[in-house]
Design a protein with these regions (language model features):
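Structural preference for beta-rich elements and adjacent junctions enriched in aromatics
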Residues: 1-145
Length: 145
């Protein structure tokens, strides 16, 4: 596994940022326990997904991220009791989307997920979904002040 691969097939944390409800395109960020990342923009037309990776993903357009494990080594397939992730997504990376950067009063639709494949697959979501993480109409709302 590595950066820009199908991280969602393993343990991962994800955030979805839908910055403009009038346009079905949103940003998805995934981070694995091994600190691999997948930043993509998703045009979602009636459940058909077309992921686009960032171009010129460097400098102040690049995310910053880190992970750590609890109770074991940070290894692929390693036995751990848990893991932590932190990341910073710069507005400059989101510039192709509308309402970026946000101003006071701006509303973005957002959802966050954690997928755990250790034993039985377990999904955790900030806002409930029925079938797919890409149900952007079910995302919660961030209001910027």
């Amino acid at each position: 596994m590595g950066d820009f691969l199908n991280l969602f097939t393993e343990d991962v944390v994800e955030v979805f940022l839908w910055t403009d409800e009038s346009f079905p395109v949103y940003f998805e960020y995934e981070l694995s326990p091994l600190d691999y990342e997948l930043p993509i923009i998703i045009p979602n037309y009636n459940g058909k997904f077309y992921g686009w990776q960032p171009w010129h993903y460097e400098g102040d357009r690049r995310t910053r991220h880190a992970t750590s494990t609890l109770g074991g080594e940070k290894l692929s397939g390693g036995i751990v009791s848990g893991w932590r992730a932190e990341f910073f997504i710069p507005y400059k990376l989101l510039v192709p989307l509308n309402q970026v950067p946000p101003v006071s009063g701006t509303k973005w639709r957002v959802n966050m997920y954690r997928i755990d494949y250790d034993n039985a697959t377990t999904h955790f979501a900030w806002q409930k979904i029925s079938k797919s993480f890409h149900e952007y109409n079910n995302f919660g709302t961030f209001i910027f002040e």
